[in-house]
Regions:
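N-terminal targeting signals for export/organelle localization
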Residues: 1-65, 236
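Coil residues (strongly favoring Ser/Thr
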Residues: 49, 60, 76-77, 121, ...
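Short, small/polar residue-rich loop motifs at catalytic or cofactor-binding pockets
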Residues: 63-65, 87-88, 187-189
């Protein structure tokens, strides 16, 4: 994968991100051959070993994020991974009454959203409320409108508390205190989580850190290159 193609995606799609963040994305050297290294996968599910031509080969299988049934700010019931099959997803967590970290988290998610408007068929941004008791459909819609969300591309959603909390802990593999989603349980993660079209986790980012938000943007661009290259091969 050549840098020239990657730069056209980054600088075409992310220019609007650089000004709000106070800097532009610096594409570091990825090797003397001009190729890039794609974001690694997280969550090893299993490792199989085989002997091929007398040599030991390891085949690593990575965790696949299971689907989640939610209701959105538009009142739609969505199975997220089925609805957005083949798309890159960026997840974060919030609740509408939060006055501490949620506003800056949501503003940074908005910046990412705006940065990739030209790639809106390939990416969806998913903000999951950790307070389903309070965050009803009308409340989610008002909150989405407050941040001028494109409702087709940026989904504000929730589900049962146990479903959301289990998804954060056991599917997105966030490092959170143990709990069972009951009334006393509460999580407030500040990470953005990048999931590729195969539902493998490809990155964790501090959504309050501008450098990490840039890194998330860079990794999204890498996955777009990966997606486009696969598509081009199929067309040949």
């Amino acid at each position: 994968m050549k840098k020239g193609r990657l730069k056209s995606i980054i600088f075409g799609g992310l220019f609007s991100l650089f000004i709000p963040l106070g800097a532009y994305l610096f594409l570091k050297s990825k090797g003397h051959d001009g190729h890039i290294t794609l974001p690694k996968q997280y969550g090893i599910a299993s490792i199989d070993s085989n002997i091929v031509d007398g040599k030991l080969q390891l085949d690593t299988t990575y965790h696949t994020v299971a689907d989640l049934l939610v209701y959105s700010q538009l009142g739609d019931t969505l199975a997220l991974h089925e609805t957005y099959k083949g798309k890159i997803l960026v997840y974060n967590f919030f609740f509408t009454s939060c006055q501490t970290i949620c506003p800056p988290l949501t503003k940074n998610m908005k910046l990412l959203n705006k940065a990739f408007l030209k790639n809106d068929t390939s990416i969806r941004f998913i903000s999951l409320s950790v307070d389903p008791l309070h965050d009803s459909v009308p409340v989610l819609r008002r909150y989405a409108n407050q941040y001028e969300a494109n409702h087709d591309k940026w989904i504000f959603a929730t589900a049962s508390k146990k479903s959301i909390y289990d998804f954060a802990r056991y599917q997105l593999l966030l490092d959170l205190p143990q709990g069972n989603g009951d009334e006393q349980d509460f999580i407030h993660p500040e990470q953005f989580v990048l999931v590729d079209k195969y539902r493998n986790i490809r990155g964790y980012y501090n959504g309050l850190d501008s450098n990490d938000v840039r890194r998330c943007a860079e990794d999204i661009a890498y996955l777009l290159v990966e997606k486009n290259k696969i598509h081009e091969k199929k067309k040949r």
